[in-house]
Amino acid sequence: MDLENKVKKMGLGHEQGFGAPCLKCKEKCEGFELHFWRKICRNCKCGQEEHDVLLSNEEDRKVGKLFEDTKYTTLIAKLKSDGIPMYKRNVMILTNPVAAKKNVSINTVTYEWAPPVQNQALARQYMQMLPKEKQPVAGSEGAQYRKKQLAKQLPAHDQDPSKCHELSPREVNEMEQFVKKYKSEALGVGDVKLPCEMDAQVPKQMNIPGGDRSTPAAVGAMEDKSAEHKRTQYSCYCCKLSMKEGDPAIYAERAGYDKLWHPACFVCSTCHELLVDMIYFWKNEKLYCGRHYCDSEKPRCAGCDELIFSNEYTQAENQNWHLKHFCCFDCDSILAGEIYVMVNDKPVCKPCYVKNHAVVCQGCHNAIDPEVQRVTYNNFSWHASTECFLCSCCSKCLIGQKFMPVEGMVFCSVECKKRMS
């Protein structure tokens, strides 16, 4: 398929999750409706991951595409119908007998994801070492956490040009090369193993002064070192604390098998969240989630959340923006050369600010223009003018004067306060 056809096929998937309720805003949101180029809901401005959208198949396709053309093809299966790679997510079902007065019932726990290891006891140990609120038990807070992290850490628009907004053929080509590069140089999946088993598989490299590994002296020294090593504790690469004997650890092949992590410590070095499904990116001796690895390589547009592959983009408020996406967060009007105000780290044009966000003057009860000076005390504001910031009793101007605030009113003296009480 040539680049022009790829560009034509692009779309953000506006039908996915349409009308789904927002788990954060509740009834304040009318239901999920994807903005035409931002990755947020048009109604409540929250991301798709904050809505109750059933995306298991879509997420499995996304991760399947991530593992395509990598050494992790054992974790994917291609559908016969369309040839799209699907993530073979390992689901673990545990059954525990529960004693009752008359008979024994079975309690079933389903984990929506579990480490792909043959030893189920090891997988169960791994799960128990995670914080309870992050264990991906179906229908639980932990399952919702995993779903949210899949969306946050591994955005589809960081690997698939068809999920991006109006890329040029040149940008599509650059993105494909970028994805190919990080798949070959940084992408990895953690291994859950017992440290003692790893020692048997991967011999330690030892520096023995004054002897060669093949000499009897060297062999004796190695045996001493081996015995000594068995007595020592393994330390987590993240927290530096010792691993308990018999507890599973996580290894990352790209980091080298001399490093290991507690299950709860296998986190992104930027956002410090658990690396979802143990999918990591390794760079400069650090673990990253997909999002923050890409952020370390490319600028990301604060408007559409996509990586920027264009040579021309703008920087404002310590953030990067596609030229066409430096827009008002409320009405989407382009802000280049216009007055804007930052509201919760989002740029808003002056008309929208006055209409939707401006504070109201306690004196004249009109919105306060962002360019006009004002006086603020607690949650109350006034125009800093002789017409507005006045004693509520005698109308004396209080600019530069001492005043007594009382429930939105201000007084110049105790006497004036008493007159109004």
Curated annotation (Swiss-Prot):
GO cellular component: cytoplasm; focal adhesion
Subcellular location: Cytoplasm; Cell junction, Focal adhesion
Coiled coil: none
InterPro entries: LIM1_Testin, LIM2_Testin, LIM3_Testin, PET_domain, PET_testin, Pk/Esn/Tes, Znf_LIM
GO biological process terms held by the UniProt record: negative regulation of cell population proliferation
Domains as described in the record: The N-terminal and the C-terminal halves of the protein can associate with each other, thereby hindering interactions with ZYX.
Protein's UniProt name: Testin
Organism: Nomascus leucogenys (Northern white-cheeked gibbon)
Lineage per the UniProt record: Eukaryota, Metazoa, Chordata, Craniata, Vertebrata
